[in-house]
Regions:
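Bulky hydrophobic segments
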Residues: 1-119, 123-148
C-alpha cells in the first residue's frame, strides 16, 4: 500500500497528465515534417470521409491505449480537487478536442494519415481511463489518495 501512495501522489498525477499530453502530441505529429496542403486536397477529404470500420486492429488498440493515461490521470486530478461530475465531462470533451486537433494537424504531415475514426478511438481511451480511475476511487479509495 505504501508503494501505491508514493506512485499515485497528486504531483505524480499532474506529471502523468502532462506527460500523457506530451506523448500523445509527439506520437501523433512525429516526424514533424509539415507541408502546405490546399483546401482542395485529397488529404482533407480523407479526414472527413473515414468511418469507424477503417483502420486495422493494431491502430485501433494503439489509439485507445494512447489516451487511457490522459483519462486516468485527469480523472484522478479532478477527484482530488473538485469531484463535481461535470468536470469529468469537461475532461472527456477536452481530450476529444485534443484528439480532433491532432487529426486536423496531421493533414499537413504527408507521412501521417489523418482520420476522424482515430479521434473516436482516442475518445474511447479517455473514457476507459476515467472509468478505471472512478472504479479505483470507489473500490480502493486508499490506494490512489495521498496526503500531498
Amino acid at each position: 500500500r505504501m508503494i501505491f501512495n508514493v506512485i499515485f501522489t497528486g504531483k505524480c498525477m499532474k506529471g502523468l497528465f502532462l506527460f500523457s499530453i506530451f506523448v500523445v502530441t509527439y506520437a501523433s505529429l512525429f516526424p514533424f515534417e509539415f507541408q502546405y496542403v490546399s483546401l482542395e486536397s485529397d488529404r482533407i477529404n480523407d479526414l472527413l470521409s473515414t468511418s469507424l470500420t477503417g483502420g486495422v486492429i493494431g491502430d485501433v488498440l494503439g489509439n485507445i491505449i494512447l489516451f487511457i493515461p490522459f483519462g486516468f490521470a485527469g480523472a484522478e486530478l479532478i477527484s482530488r480537487n473538485n469531484p463535481d461530475k461535470k468536470y469529468y465531462i469537461y475532461l472527456i470533451l477536452s481530450g476529444f478536442a485534443l484528439a480532433l486537433a491532432l487529426q486536423v494537424i496531421q493533414i499537413y504531415l504527408p507521412s501521417r494519415v489523418p482520420a476522424l475514426y482515430d479521434a473516436v478511438w482516442n475518445l474511447a481511451g479517455i473514457t476507459i481511463g476515467v472509468v478505471i480511475a472512478l472504479f479505483m476511487d470507489h473500490h480502493f479509495p486508499n490506494v490512489l489518495k495521498s496526503d500531498d
